[in-house]
């Protein structure tokens, strides 16, 4: 056998190459349910001299779906952006895994939290599959890159995008783009995911699918934060709800404690009725309307 092709030498060479060019697993092992992954403490954000967030404190825990609700302009998306590190805070602190956000690099944050923004734009003509594959880029040259193919295939399947995976992202409908963007976030497989109005462009069936996915991920050990306008979805799927009013936390707790007629009527500036479904017992939040 030629020395150049000796199997032992080949294996030794591969091991050396991996030790030199492949990073070790950059994140700690999974943590128990209830562990805090993100914490905002007394944060404030000001734009144009106007407070957008004012003394907001909230924590994000493994195993929970935390839903942010409130009227337009209440600060929901700004709070999500502050938690993700995409929005600087003027006072207060935000910690990710017990370290200030400013102490993490962009890559380290991408390995710990995945973000779905409101606007899903792609500047080049990538296919849907390529956009989803981008979710795996934080794990390049780490042991977790071995999971790339499985993570991408699973995300495509559960977000129902397989049928148009090879079409250009720019040629997709708004709802299809939203599902592709969500698949990218899920393919990233981080311990925390933050979703800004993930159901906004979706039909009724896909709205339920998205929230079931959020619920399932939480049960599997993920911390999930979702911005929603639909209070019925929030009531059905949230473990905790934070109600924002003019940049401040008006309420923070389980849906049954937070979704009161008095609070919601005040926050939304419109009479609200909170009732129990006669069959399922689910909480329903309805605007009161004049009889026709």
From Swiss-Prot:
Record domain ABC transporter: where: 38-271
Gene Ontology MF terms in the entry: ATP binding; ATP hydrolysis activity
Binding residues annotated for ATP, in chain numbering: 70-77
GO cellular component entries: plasma membrane
S-S pairs: none
Location relative to the cell: Cell membrane
Pfam family, one: ABC_tran
Function: Part of the ABC transporter complex HmuTUV involved in hemin import. Responsible for energy coupling to the transport system.
Record-stated family: Belongs to the ABC transporter superfamily. Heme (hemin) importer (TC 3.A.1.14.5) family.
Protein name: Hemin import ATP-binding protein HmuV
Gene giving rise to this polypeptide: hmuV
């Amino acid at each position: 056998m030629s020395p150049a092709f000796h199997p032992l030498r080949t294996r030794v060479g591969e091991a050396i190459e991996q030790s030199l060019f492949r990073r070790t697993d950059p994140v700690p092992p999974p943590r128990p349910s209830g562990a805090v992954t993100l914490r905002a403490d007394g944060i404030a954000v000001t734009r144009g001299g106007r407070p957008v967030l004012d003394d907001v404190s909230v924590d994000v825990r493994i195993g929970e779906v935390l839903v942010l609700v409130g009227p337009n302009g209440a600060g929901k998306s700004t709070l999500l952006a502050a938690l993700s590190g995409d929005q600087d805070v003027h006072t207060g602190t935000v910690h990710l895994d017990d370290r200030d956000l400013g102490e993490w690099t962009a890559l380290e944050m991408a390995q710990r939290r995945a973000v779905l923004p409101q606007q899903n734009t792609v500047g080049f003509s990538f296919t849907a599959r390529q956009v989803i594959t981008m979710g795996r880029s934080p794990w390049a040259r780490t042991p977790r890159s071995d999971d790339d193919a499985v993570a991408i295939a699973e995300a495509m399947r559960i977000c129902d995008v397989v049928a148009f995976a090879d079409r250009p992202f720019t040629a997709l409908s708004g709802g299809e783009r939203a599902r592709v963007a969500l698949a990218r976030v899920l393919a990233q497989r981080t311990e925390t995911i933050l979703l800004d109005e993930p159901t906004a462009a979706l039909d009724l069936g896909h709205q339920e699918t998205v929230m079931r996915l959020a619920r399932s991920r939480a049960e599997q050990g993920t911390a999930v934060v979702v911005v929603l306008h639909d209070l019925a979805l929030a009531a059905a799927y949230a473990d905790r709800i934070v109600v924002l009013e003019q940049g401040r936390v008006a309420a923070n707790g389980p849906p049954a404690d937070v979704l009161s007629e008095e609070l919601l009527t005040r926050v939304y500036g419109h009479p609200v009725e909170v009732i129990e479904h006669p069959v399922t017992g689910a909480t329903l939040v309805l605007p009161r309307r004049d009889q026709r």
